[in-house]
Amino acid sequence: MNNPSTTKAPLADYLAHLPLAEEERERLGESASFSELHARLAGAEGAAADAGGDPALASVRARLQLGTPELDDAEMFGVDAQGRTFLKISPPIRRTKVIPEPWRTNILVRGWRRLTGRSNPPKPKRALPRARWQRVGSLRRFILLLLMLAQTSVATYYMKGILPYQGWAFVDLEELAQQSLLDTVQQVLPYVIQFGILALFAILFCWVSAGFWTALMGFWELLTGRDRYRISGSSAGSEPIAADARTAIVMPICNEDVPRVFAGLRATVESMAATGEMERFDFFVLSDTNDPDIAVAEQQAWLELCRETKGFGKIFYRRRRRRVKRKSGNIDDFCRRWGGDYRYMVVMDADSVMSGDCLAKLVRLMEANPEAGIIQTAPKASGMDTLYARMQQFATRVYGPLFTAGLHFWQLGESHYWGHNAIIRMQPFIDHCALAPLPGKGSFAGAILSHDFVEAALMRRAGWGVWIAYDLDGSYEELPPNLLDELKRDRRWCHGNLMNFRLFLVKGMHPVHRAVFLTGVMSYLSAPLWFFFLVLSTALLAVHQLMEPQYFLEPRQLFPIWPQWHPEKAIALFSTTLTLLFLPKLLSVMLIWAKGAKGFGGVIRVTLSMLLEMFFSVLLAPVRMLFHTRFVLAAFLGWSVQWNSPQRDDDATPWSEAIRRHGMQTLLGIAWTLLVAWLNPRFLWWLSPIVGSLILSIPVSVISSRVKLGLRARDEKLFLIPEEYDTPRELRATDEYTYENRWHALKDGFLKAAVDPLLNALACAMGTARHNRAQAIETVRGERIGKAIEKGPEQLDGATRLALLSDPVALSRLHTRVWEEDRDDWLGRWRKAEADDPHAASVPLAQVVPGDAGLLPAAQS
């Protein structure tokens, strides 16, 4: 029993943090204990919960009504079988079976199963009607293959003529067997190195050729505008959307920047509402967050978003307890629970923003193309201010359309899916695109990391088309703010693409998607191939300089075989390679010249921006090469991959971090320079772009991450993009809401969920008590609460925090004990956090009038 004299002070503090009328606050202040206070707050409605020994849980509804009166009008409250109040933060569950097909990646195993009479999984029965675009696509890809092989053959022939040692045909293997090992090495080593150089050159040149022809055809598509197979042309854009064509817009998040995420989502919701089609769309925030502070911030942000947009019953939130299969598992879980309620699903990333017109257009395109399973938009990058991010924004905005249109030209309805800003036909996705873990052990087994390419391949295997709507406006994303954050993202993409290659020979995959798996691997494998090419070139230089040339390769050879050097061929081949690499960029800018460069700063500024971006891309390419080489080796060696969310906000790289990450690259660049200078200083002219970039990697990484330089470049109209010149409404709203959200961002979320009367009510109402009362459960709850009381908020571990946050009964009991026992470690820390927050509402809190903005801690500006 509490002593009334010792209870009055904390009780008055508690009431001061509830938005009450003064008369009501005085009446409740007469309570003799916190149990009585909660009973008075709850009234008769809380009797069931209070009977279970949870006085704070009994008043959850009353406290939430005080802070957010709109919840009652929106009928957001529910009561579970135990009489506990909860918020209807998600629709009723209507479960659908989501059963992944086990992978059989080994063709020998499949053959053995066939021989022994055991069946392999059949190919899905449905097939697309043989449309004209399929024949056209096959013909186009055959032509592309011929162009790549022809171009590579000519270049490789030239490369063979450039290399100095031309006497391989005179090497007699029988003679080699009769001479000493040292003589054999001296005679054969130059030719072995040359063969390696030639093989690597052919692979790399073919890879560059593929990109060149893709960009060239994209240029033609965009210049002429005569793409008869453009999927966005299949809808007029004004057709009414059928009432049963319901669409779920899902946003999977994990430990993200909460103010930015919910700002972008709010801008998207408001844009959707402005179209008048809102009743056919629902929004889902699917959280895999395991940081308790961020999880509480997400809960508050969801409530504020619903209140500001009147989105109760349209915007839903769910946080998973069991985070299996990462993002793909999160989507699977949504499909299993609510997928049957929707015909389509739009997947957004945490940094995505989409206009309502774009979303409605995607649904209309799906309705107009019943054979389409996925339609992918081409998101435009925007919203970043660092110099590095602005250069990347400019590059993707200027050059990206060529490559995206080119991909569409070659692939048509057998195209890419990038995992976000795309619409998916729900039923075939549920039936065919669930991902089983890859069999076996090691780093290339287990849950699939890069799920998007695989889901597109499975959708096409099941007979549905996968399209890119490359000319659809209103789809946006953000890029990493600096080089190191981009490389963190690249590491997990690298591992995921290497894993996906295990599916190359899976039964039923379309050849185009087998090629997609191959290009995904080459996106990263090209880095170590390029590195080894440079190493072999240096080794050949060393052999040429340090070993005595072998002019006579057979006993009765009449004329010597002189090492050859053809600088004119070398220059021609070098020029050709540069043309393939940089002509797409020039064509992109020429297209802008033709269509109007005003949005890019004008003709002069866009041209200067292109030249500066080309210089920086040359400067950063060797740095990326070494990092990607490391990533590939790490994947093959089984080093772990951390799936941390990339930095979404502008962030500068500190010098200490740059030295730690780039220090070895700088030392390698210096050592490589000294070695080549010692061997043959003239060769440094060819190698200087490589070693120079490595030596300068530290200052380039730091300087390019600076916001000040990025803003200055924008003031000078450098790296300008149309979204900055004439900012779309959705992006303006995102910036505005991000600023507002940061102004009153919630900090110390778990501490406030445990102590603050309003946030505790919200956290308890959004949690789910999954089990009935049982002694074992009560024992575990008691241990967790006791541990929290003993350790205090500073020392309590993250796992226990998360467990308490996920259990509303335990969280409400912790709340009760903290206040009843006047725990200074909890209350003192909470009061200090309130005092340190310049945007905290002044106490005592004023009563909230229905229709006002509502009131939650740190929600006042």
Swiss-Prot record:
- Give the UniProt record's GO annotations in the biological process aspect: glucan biosynthetic process
What stretches pass through the bilayer? 142-162, 188-208, 516-536, 573-593, 600-620, 683-703
- SUPFAM superfamilies per the UniProt record, alphabetical: Nucleotide-diphospho-sugar transferases
Q: Which GO terms describe its cellular component?
A: plasma membrane
Annotated EC:
2.4.1.-
MF terms in GO: hexosyltransferase activity
Its subcellular locations are: Cell inner membrane
Pathway terms, separated by semicolons: Glycan metabolism; osmoregulated periplasmic glucan (OPG) biosynthesis
Under the heading InterPro entries, the entry gives:
Glucans_biosynth_gluTrFase_H, Glyco_trans_2-like, Glycosyltr_2/OpgH_subfam, Nucleotide-diphossugar_trans
User: What is the recorded membrane topology of this protein?
Assistant: Multi-pass membrane protein
Q: What is its main location?
A: membrane
Print the keywords alphabetically. Answer: Cell inner membrane, Cell membrane, Glycosyltransferase, Membrane, Transferase, Transmembrane, Transmembrane helix
Q: Which PANTHER family match?
A: CELLULOSE SYNTHASE CATALYTIC SUBUNIT A [UDP-FORMING] (PTHR43867), GLUCANS BIOSYNTHESIS GLUCOSYLTRANSFERASE H (PTHR43867:SF5)
Please state which protein family the record places this protein in. Belongs to the glycosyltransferase 2 family. OpgH subfamily.
User: What this chain does, per the record?
Assistant: Involved in the biosynthesis of osmoregulated periplasmic glucans (OPGs).
Q: Fetch the NCBIfam families from UniProt.
A: PRK05454.1-1, PRK05454.2-1, PRK05454.2-5
UniProt-recorded name of the protein: Glucans biosynthesis glucosyltransferase H
The species this protein belongs to is: Pseudomonas aeruginosa (strain UCBPP-PA14)
User: What's the gene?
Assistant: opgH
